[in-house]
From Swiss-Prot:
GO cellular component, one term: cytoplasm
Record Gene3D superfamilies: HUPs (3.40.50.620)
Pfam families for this protein: Usp
Subcellular location: Cytoplasm
Residue ranges that the Swiss-Prot or TrEMBL entry lists as coiled coil: none
Originating species: Staphylococcus epidermidis (strain ATCC 35984 / DSM 28319 / BCRC 17069 / CCUG 31568 / BM 3577 / RP62A)
Record keywords: Cytoplasm
The keyword Cytoplasm is annotated on this UniProt entry: yes
Protein name: Putative universal stress protein SERP1273
Family: Belongs to the universal stress protein A family.
The organism's place on the tree of life at top rank: Bacteria
Amino acid sequence: MISYKNILIAVDGSHEAEWAFNKAVGVAKRNDAQLTIVNVIDSRTYSSYEVYDAQFTEKSKHFSEELLKGYKEVATNAGVKNVDTRLEFGSPKAIIPKKLARDVGADLIMSGTSGLNAVERFIVGSVSEAIVRHAPCDVLVVRTEEMPEDFQPQVATPQLREKYQD
């Protein structure tokens, strides 16, 4: 039987990512695996600003740090023994499969499905698709069709998002 020992889960604050995170916690527990929770702040967001908005960057960073701290606490409380977090800046499509997966020695990357609509996916593609195409290890993309309509995130709550909105 194949078992995974080093699982990387990508989170972005969306409901889909938290649903995938919950499943990653279950997989990590069943396999007694290391769980690395990653968030990549897409620095391309800032390229459209003529003047670099340091306040916006700081808000994004603080949101991500709080998000990762919350997810680590949930995973630890659920019984995952070895939990780590990573915060990176850059393109999630490149950093997750090409850098982070190798840096942490992941043998499984888990990700939620994209929140993009069909047109956006056609134009820019999804992070999940990029991970599948470029990962050096197995990838599990968690589908959200089975996510209950009343699913309420524990970490990426509306209150947390409101705290860091402009």
